[in-house]
């Protein structure tokens, strides 16, 4: 049986992921304590089911510590994949504000005057919500490492659905490569497996004609391709990824996220990410995401 275990931060998109699984024919259960998954899998297998999707989160926090043990047991008989969805605190606060829902760990009284809470209160933010989010992040951190992580902070719903569909795909392939451009001034992507810094490359930003463009526009491409340093770094990154890709495949990875960062995430990192994606598309499944441009492809 194929089992997809979804966990992660409240408000990060687990319901969207579970809906994608359900649309794909999975038998789906939300908020099931981990210790009950093996029994459910046995029952469903006896009934002829071949695909199971389970979401478990902080609402079942007493059973979260049993997840690694449960996954080990399940993998003796089933094909098990773990998916961990996360998002920045700022993004989660905004989502809760829009939906007006209460976080599972929110406390209304007796909040400590932590530095984060004092700063948040000065900005008029809900300190109980921020504290709950950070508490949840700490409690869930042991589950993030063994799972495939997706940071949904800037993802549109349709892009998240596309990633989930690729993640659960039954089509034979070794691994899916995600090349993600970003700007260091906005923070490093939390779901990156490899991070490359290209800030030392010549910057089109200082050309007033190129400044409003992106690394996908031909004038910027022409500028960067005329720089030997840019081509050399792109080749070095390509060679590194290609050399170590078999090791990630041998580690049973379904995804490998390669993040390319420049200062603002508009020119150099976008160009390098696109160049790498073009090369590796001939080798398998490739996705591209330009975080600061809010573009997925």
From Swiss-Prot:
The lineage of its organism: Bacteria, Pseudomonadati, Pseudomonadota, Betaproteobacteria, Burkholderiales. This is Nucleotide-binding protein Rpic_0258. The keyword Manganese does not apply. It comes from the Bacteria. GO terms for molecular function: ATP binding; GTP binding. It holds the Pfam family PapZ_C. HAMAP family: RapZ_like. Displays ATPase and GTPase activities. It comes from Ralstonia pickettii (strain 12J). Keywords: ATP-binding, GTP-binding, Nucleotide-binding. Belongs to the RapZ-like family. GTP binds at residues 57-60. Disulfide bonds: none annotated. ATP binds at residues 8-15.
């Amino acid at each position: 049986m194929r089992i997809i275990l979804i966990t992660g931060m409240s408000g990060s998109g687990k319901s969207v992921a579970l809906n994608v699984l359900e649309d794909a024919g999975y038998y789906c259960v939300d908020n099931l304590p981990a210790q009950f998954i093996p029994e459910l899998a046995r029952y469903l297998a006896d009934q002829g089911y071949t695909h199971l999707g389970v979401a478990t989160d902080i609402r079942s926090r007493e059973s979260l510590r049993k997840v690694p043990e449960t996954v080990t047991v399940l993998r003796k008989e089933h094909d098990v994949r773990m998916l961990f969805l996360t998002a920045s605190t700022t993004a989660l606060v905004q989502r809760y504000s829009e939906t007006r829902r209460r976080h599972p760990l929110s406390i209304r009284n007796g909040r400590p005057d932590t530095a984060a809470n004092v700063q948040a209160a000065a900005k008029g933010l809900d300190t109980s919500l921020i504290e709950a989010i950070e508490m949840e992040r700490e409690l869930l951190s042991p589950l993030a490492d063994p799972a495939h992580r997706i940071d949904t902070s800037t993802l549109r719903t349709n892009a998240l659905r596309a990633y989930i569909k690729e993640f659960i795909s039954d089509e034979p392939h070794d691994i899916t490569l995600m090349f993600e451009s970003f700007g260091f001034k906005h923070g490093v992507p939390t779901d990156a497996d490899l991070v490359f810094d290209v800030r030392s490359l010549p910057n089109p930003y200082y050309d007033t004609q190129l400044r409003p463009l992106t690394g996908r526009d031909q004038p910027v491409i022409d500028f960067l391709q005329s720089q030997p340093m840019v081509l050399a770094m792109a080749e070095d990154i390509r060679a590194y990824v290609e050399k170590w890709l078999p090791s990630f495949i041998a580690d049973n990875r379904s995804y490998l996220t390669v993040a390319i960062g420049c200062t603002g995430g508009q020119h150099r990192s976008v160009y390098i990410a696109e160049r790498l994606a073009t090369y590796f598309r001939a080798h398998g499944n490739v996705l591209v995401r330009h975080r600061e441009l809010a573009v997925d492809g």
